[in-house]
Protein backbone atom coordinates (compact mmCIF):
# COMPACT_ATOMS: atom_id res chain seq x y z
CA UNK A 1 0.00 0.00 0.00
CA UNK A 2 1.27 3.44 -0.81
CA UNK A 3 0.83 6.64 -2.76
CA UNK A 4 2.10 7.09 -6.32
CA UNK A 5 4.47 10.07 -6.30
CA UNK A 6 5.94 9.77 -9.79
CA UNK A 7 4.90 7.62 -12.71
CA UNK A 8 7.24 7.52 -15.73
CA UNK A 9 5.66 6.78 -19.10
CA UNK A 10 7.33 3.40 -19.07
CA UNK A 11 9.48 1.74 -16.47
CA UNK A 12 11.35 -1.21 -17.93
CA UNK A 13 12.42 -3.49 -15.10
CA UNK A 14 12.26 -7.29 -15.20
CA UNK A 15 11.28 -7.76 -11.54
CA UNK A 16 11.30 -6.28 -8.04
CA UNK A 17 12.39 -9.41 -6.19
CA UNK A 18 16.10 -8.51 -5.92
CA UNK A 19 15.61 -4.85 -5.08
CA UNK A 20 15.77 -3.13 -1.70
CA UNK A 21 12.62 -1.64 -0.22
CA UNK A 22 12.08 -3.05 3.26
CA UNK A 23 11.42 -0.31 5.86
CA UNK A 24 12.10 2.40 3.25
CA UNK A 25 10.12 5.64 3.05
CA UNK A 26 10.13 5.42 -0.75
CA UNK A 27 10.53 2.57 -3.22
CA UNK A 28 10.44 2.46 -7.03
CA UNK A 29 8.66 -0.48 -8.63
CA UNK A 30 7.47 -1.25 -12.15
CA UNK A 31 3.99 0.10 -12.81
CA UNK A 32 2.72 -3.38 -13.70
CA UNK A 33 3.42 -4.48 -10.11
CA UNK A 34 1.20 -1.78 -8.59
CA UNK A 35 -2.48 -2.17 -7.68
CA UNK A 36 -4.91 0.64 -7.01
CA UNK A 37 -6.23 0.72 -3.46
CA UNK A 38 -10.04 0.46 -3.69
CA UNK A 39 -12.10 3.40 -2.49
CA UNK A 40 -12.97 3.15 1.19
CA UNK A 41 -9.95 1.03 2.09
CA UNK A 42 -7.43 2.72 4.40
CA UNK A 43 -3.68 2.65 3.82
CA UNK A 44 -3.30 0.55 6.97
CA UNK A 45 -5.81 -2.03 5.76
CA UNK A 46 -4.31 -2.09 2.27
CA UNK A 47 -0.91 -2.87 3.78
CA UNK A 48 -2.27 -6.34 4.56
CA UNK A 49 -2.89 -7.08 0.89
CA UNK A 50 0.48 -8.83 0.60
CA UNK A 51 -0.03 -11.43 3.38
CA UNK A 52 -3.66 -11.75 2.29
CA UNK A 53 -2.55 -12.54 -1.26
CA UNK A 54 -0.11 -15.16 0.03
CA UNK A 55 -2.92 -16.71 2.08
CA UNK A 56 -5.30 -16.63 -0.87
CA UNK A 57 -2.86 -18.46 -3.13
CA UNK A 58 -2.47 -21.15 -0.46
CA UNK A 59 -6.25 -21.48 -0.16
CA UNK A 60 -6.55 -21.75 -3.94
CA UNK A 61 -4.01 -24.60 -3.90
CA UNK A 62 -6.05 -26.30 -1.18
CA UNK A 63 -8.94 -26.70 -3.68
CA UNK A 64 -11.47 -26.64 -0.85
CA UNK A 65 -14.58 -28.66 -1.77
CA UNK A 66 -17.91 -27.03 -0.97
CA UNK A 67 -18.85 -27.85 2.61
CA UNK A 68 -15.41 -29.15 3.56
CA UNK A 69 -14.03 -29.00 7.09
CA UNK A 70 -10.73 -27.12 7.26
CA UNK A 71 -8.01 -26.89 9.90
CA UNK A 72 -5.61 -23.94 9.80
CA UNK A 73 -2.49 -24.29 11.94
CA UNK A 74 -0.95 -20.97 12.98
CA UNK A 75 -2.60 -17.84 14.39
CA UNK A 76 -0.32 -15.25 12.77
CA UNK A 77 -1.29 -13.00 9.82
CA UNK A 78 -1.16 -15.74 7.16
CA UNK A 79 -3.10 -18.19 9.31
CA UNK A 80 -5.75 -15.63 10.25
CA UNK A 81 -6.24 -14.57 6.64
CA UNK A 82 -6.17 -18.13 5.27
CA UNK A 83 -8.86 -19.14 7.76
CA UNK A 84 -11.14 -16.29 6.68
CA UNK A 85 -10.50 -17.06 3.01
CA UNK A 86 -11.32 -20.73 3.60
CA UNK A 87 -14.69 -19.55 4.91
CA UNK A 88 -15.17 -17.42 1.82
CA UNK A 89 -14.19 -20.41 -0.37
CA UNK A 90 -17.13 -22.42 0.97
CA UNK A 91 -15.85 -24.44 3.92
CA UNK A 92 -18.62 -25.58 6.27
CA UNK A 93 -16.33 -25.39 9.31
CA UNK A 94 -12.97 -23.70 9.81
CA UNK A 95 -10.86 -24.53 12.87
CA UNK A 96 -7.77 -22.57 13.87
CA UNK A 97 -4.99 -24.01 16.02
CA UNK A 98 -2.65 -21.51 17.63
CA UNK A 99 -0.71 -20.56 20.73
CA UNK A 100 -2.30 -17.30 21.96
CA UNK A 101 -5.82 -17.14 23.41
CA UNK A 102 -6.01 -13.45 22.41
CA UNK A 103 -5.22 -14.24 18.77
CA UNK A 104 -7.70 -17.11 18.73
CA UNK A 105 -10.36 -14.77 20.15
CA UNK A 106 -9.71 -12.37 17.26
CA UNK A 107 -10.12 -15.27 14.83
CA UNK A 108 -13.52 -16.02 16.38
CA UNK A 109 -14.49 -12.34 15.95
CA UNK A 110 -13.61 -12.69 12.26
CA UNK A 111 -15.92 -15.68 11.75
CA UNK A 112 -13.74 -18.70 12.49
CA UNK A 113 -15.94 -21.45 13.91
CA UNK A 114 -13.66 -23.24 16.38
CA UNK A 115 -10.22 -22.67 17.88
CA UNK A 116 -7.63 -24.87 19.60
CA UNK A 117 -4.82 -23.60 21.82
CA UNK A 118 -2.10 -26.17 21.31
CA UNK A 119 -0.54 -25.32 24.68
CA UNK A 120 -3.75 -26.51 26.35
CA UNK A 121 -5.20 -29.18 24.05
CA UNK A 122 -4.03 -31.97 21.78
CA UNK A 123 -4.52 -30.52 18.30
CA UNK A 124 -4.88 -33.87 16.52
CA UNK A 125 -7.38 -35.28 18.99
CA UNK A 126 -9.42 -32.08 19.26
CA UNK A 127 -9.50 -31.55 15.48
CA UNK A 128 -10.89 -35.06 15.03
CA UNK A 129 -13.51 -34.44 17.73
CA UNK A 130 -14.65 -31.27 15.96
CA UNK A 131 -14.90 -32.91 12.53
CA UNK A 132 -16.03 -36.12 10.89
CA UNK A 133 -12.88 -38.26 11.16
CA UNK A 134 -10.59 -35.27 10.69
CA UNK A 135 -10.46 -32.19 8.47
CA UNK A 136 -10.44 -32.73 4.73
CA UNK A 137 -8.05 -29.81 4.30
CA UNK A 138 -5.20 -28.66 6.56
CA UNK A 139 -3.38 -25.40 5.84
CA UNK A 140 -0.13 -25.21 7.81
CA UNK A 141 1.14 -21.64 8.25
CA UNK A 142 3.26 -21.74 11.40
CA UNK A 143 6.55 -23.04 10.02
CA UNK A 144 6.85 -25.48 12.92
CA UNK A 145 8.27 -28.86 11.98
CA UNK A 146 6.07 -30.45 14.65
CA UNK A 147 3.00 -28.68 13.26
CA UNK A 148 3.53 -30.21 9.82
CA UNK A 149 3.35 -33.65 11.40
CA UNK A 150 0.28 -32.58 13.38
CA UNK A 151 -1.29 -31.77 10.02
CA UNK A 152 -0.49 -35.25 8.71
CA UNK A 153 -1.90 -36.98 11.79
CA UNK A 154 -5.07 -34.86 11.95
CA UNK A 155 -5.92 -35.07 8.25
CA UNK A 156 -8.87 -37.11 7.08
CA UNK A 157 -8.00 -39.93 4.65
CA UNK A 158 -7.77 -38.69 1.01
CA UNK A 159 -7.37 -35.14 2.33
CA UNK A 160 -4.95 -32.41 1.30
CA UNK A 161 -2.31 -30.48 3.26
CA UNK A 162 -1.00 -27.13 2.02
CA UNK A 163 2.23 -25.90 3.62
CA UNK A 164 2.68 -22.12 3.33
CA UNK A 165 5.64 -21.32 5.56
CA UNK A 166 9.36 -21.84 5.92
CA UNK A 167 10.63 -24.68 8.10
CA UNK A 168 13.73 -25.03 10.24
CA UNK A 169 16.64 -26.83 8.61
CA UNK A 170 17.21 -28.02 5.08
CA UNK A 171 14.99 -31.07 5.62
CA UNK A 172 11.86 -31.73 7.65
CA UNK A 173 10.96 -35.18 8.96
CA UNK A 174 7.42 -35.99 7.84
CA UNK A 175 5.45 -39.16 8.55
CA UNK A 176 5.37 -40.09 4.87
CA UNK A 177 4.00 -43.57 5.51
CA UNK A 178 0.97 -41.92 7.10
CA UNK A 179 0.62 -39.64 4.08
CA UNK A 180 0.69 -42.70 1.83
CA UNK A 181 -1.68 -44.81 3.94
CA UNK A 182 -4.14 -41.92 4.02
CA UNK A 183 -3.86 -41.51 0.23
CA UNK A 184 -3.26 -37.85 1.02
CA UNK A 185 -1.71 -34.92 -0.83
CA UNK A 186 1.03 -32.67 0.59
CA UNK A 187 1.36 -29.45 -1.40
CA UNK A 188 3.70 -26.48 -1.08
CA UNK A 189 2.57 -22.90 -1.68
CA UNK A 190 4.94 -20.05 -2.56
CA UNK A 191 4.17 -16.33 -2.80
CA UNK A 192 0.97 -14.94 -4.30
CA UNK A 193 0.61 -15.11 -8.10
CA UNK A 194 -2.60 -13.52 -9.44
CA UNK A 195 -3.98 -12.98 -5.93
CA UNK A 196 -3.64 -9.25 -5.15
CA UNK A 197 -6.66 -8.13 -7.17
CA UNK A 198 -9.12 -10.61 -5.64
CA UNK A 199 -8.03 -9.99 -2.04
CA UNK A 200 -8.26 -6.22 -2.45
CA UNK A 201 -11.84 -6.69 -3.66
CA UNK A 202 -12.64 -8.97 -0.71
CA UNK A 203 -11.13 -6.42 1.66
CA UNK A 204 -13.06 -3.53 0.11
CA UNK A 205 -16.33 -5.47 0.28
CA UNK A 206 -15.83 -6.30 3.96
CA UNK A 207 -15.79 -10.06 3.36
CA UNK A 208 -12.13 -10.23 4.39
CA UNK A 209 -11.67 -8.50 7.74
CA UNK A 210 -8.16 -7.16 8.18
CA UNK A 211 -8.54 -4.27 10.63
CA UNK A 212 -8.80 -6.58 13.71
CA UNK A 213 -5.47 -8.14 12.71
CA UNK A 214 -3.58 -4.83 12.97
CA UNK A 215 -2.49 -4.99 16.60
CA UNK A 216 0.23 -2.33 16.47
CA UNK A 217 0.89 0.81 14.40
CA UNK A 218 4.29 2.38 15.14
CA UNK A 219 6.34 5.21 13.61
CA UNK A 220 9.27 4.16 11.44
CA UNK A 221 11.76 5.69 13.86
CA UNK A 222 10.75 3.04 16.42
CA UNK A 223 11.83 0.22 14.10
CA UNK A 224 14.56 -1.04 16.43
CA UNK A 225 12.14 -1.33 19.36
CA UNK A 226 9.57 -3.05 17.14
CA UNK A 227 12.12 -5.64 16.00
CA UNK A 228 13.10 -6.31 19.63
CA UNK A 229 9.44 -6.73 20.55
CA UNK A 230 8.87 -9.20 17.71
CA UNK A 231 11.99 -11.21 18.53
CA UNK A 232 11.12 -11.25 22.22
CA UNK A 233 7.83 -13.08 21.53
CA UNK A 234 6.40 -11.90 24.86
CA UNK A 235 3.82 -9.41 23.62
CA UNK A 236 0.70 -10.49 21.73
CA UNK A 237 0.82 -9.27 18.15
CA UNK A 238 -0.60 -10.28 14.82
CA UNK A 239 0.39 -7.57 12.35
CA UNK A 240 2.69 -4.68 13.22
CA UNK A 241 2.64 -1.72 10.82
CA UNK A 242 5.30 0.97 10.53
CA UNK A 243 4.34 4.46 9.34
CA UNK A 244 7.02 6.77 7.86
Where in the sequence are the language-model features?
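Glycine-rich phosphate/adenylate-binding loop and adjacent beta-alpha elements
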Residues: 1-34
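A glycine-rich, Thr/Ser-enriched phosphate-binding loop motif common to dinucleotide/cofactor-binding enzymes
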Residues: 17-23, 39-61, 73-81
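Short helix-loop-beta connector
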Residues: 41-42, 63-69, 133-134
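Adenosine-nucleotide cofactor-binding segment
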Residues: 72-73, 80, 87-150
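Conserved acidic E/D residue at the C-terminus of a beta-strand in Rossmann-like folds
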Residues: 98-99, 165, 190
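C-terminal hydrophobic helical "lid"/dimerization subdomain
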Residues: 145, 149-153, 193, 197-244
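Helix-to-beta-strand junctions that scaffold the AdoMet/dcAdoMet cofactor pocket
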Residues: 155-157
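Rossmann-fold dehydrogenase core element
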Residues: 159-162, 173-213
Amino acid sequence: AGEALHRPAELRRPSYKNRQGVFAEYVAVPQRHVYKIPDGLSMEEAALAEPAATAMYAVSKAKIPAGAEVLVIGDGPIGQLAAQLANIAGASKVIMAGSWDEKLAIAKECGIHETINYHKEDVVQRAKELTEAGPEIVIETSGSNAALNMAVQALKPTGRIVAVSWYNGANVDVAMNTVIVKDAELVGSLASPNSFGPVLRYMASGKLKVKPLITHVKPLNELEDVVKMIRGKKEMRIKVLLKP
